[in-house]
Amino acid sequence: MIMLNRILGLFLACLVSGMLSARNAKELYIYHTNDMHSRVEPFPAYFPDSVLADKAGMVRRAAFIRGERERHKNLLLFDSGDFSQGSPYYNLFKGEVEIKLMNEMGYDAGTIGNHEFDFGLDNMARLFRMAEFPIVCANYAVEGTALEGLVKEYTVIERDGIRIGVFGLGAPLEGLVSRANCEGVKFEDPVAEAQRIADLLRNRERCDLVVCLSHLGWDGTPYSDVKLIECTRNIDLVLGGHSHSYFEKPKRYKNLDGMEVPVQQMGKHAAFVGKIIVTMDK
């Protein structure tokens, strides 16, 4: 059962929350980011957008995650895409800085955002080879391209006897990515692919928890997190991106079985890190 969520602003202050749980329950601490857009340095304190002022920065985030790992052994860290594009670091080094810093933070998995294509497939392949965490995306068929063998449909992680299945979904490429930068990559129906993978994770892989890293966007498009939840089953949690939506707490929508599934998204620039505590009876 997903019990609690808190938003953690990266300005060296955070909410500290207590939680009561059953004596034999196990807890997973899931932290997540989306749409970092190469925000390597923090925003200055005088930045005109007060929501972002004196927040973000990858060194801050790394220090925060390091501290959380010391407190919580069952910690997972995910990214929902678009770590690329938005600063001179990306323009000069084409994603190498961001990937290396994500490696240092110990990300457990990430999915593909549309801006990962900005310097083409060969550059994506170079970055994905550098990544020390799996890149998951179930609805981009990459066979015959530079990405073949570098993108997985899903990954399974074990923490304290709990099996967590994680898969990713990417946004439609047409209109977002130039054809030259994604030639040979085929976009497939994310709802159909999500159902296929969720069933596989639940049944064949015997996962206790199924998590979707989505770069579809929250709502209002033909493919969205809302539609994804409402048209599928066997997905327990959606960690979103792409629409730069900021939720102070998860939104919940009913799936095909009438079960409420939470979706969370943390705005942009990784100014905030999402935290969700999952309590398992296992």
What does each model-found stretch correspond to?
Residues I2-A13:
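Sec-dependent signal peptide recognition
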Residues L12-S21:
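Hydrophobic h-region of N-terminal signal peptides that target proteins for export
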Residues A22-K282:
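Acidic, metal/ion-coordinating pockets
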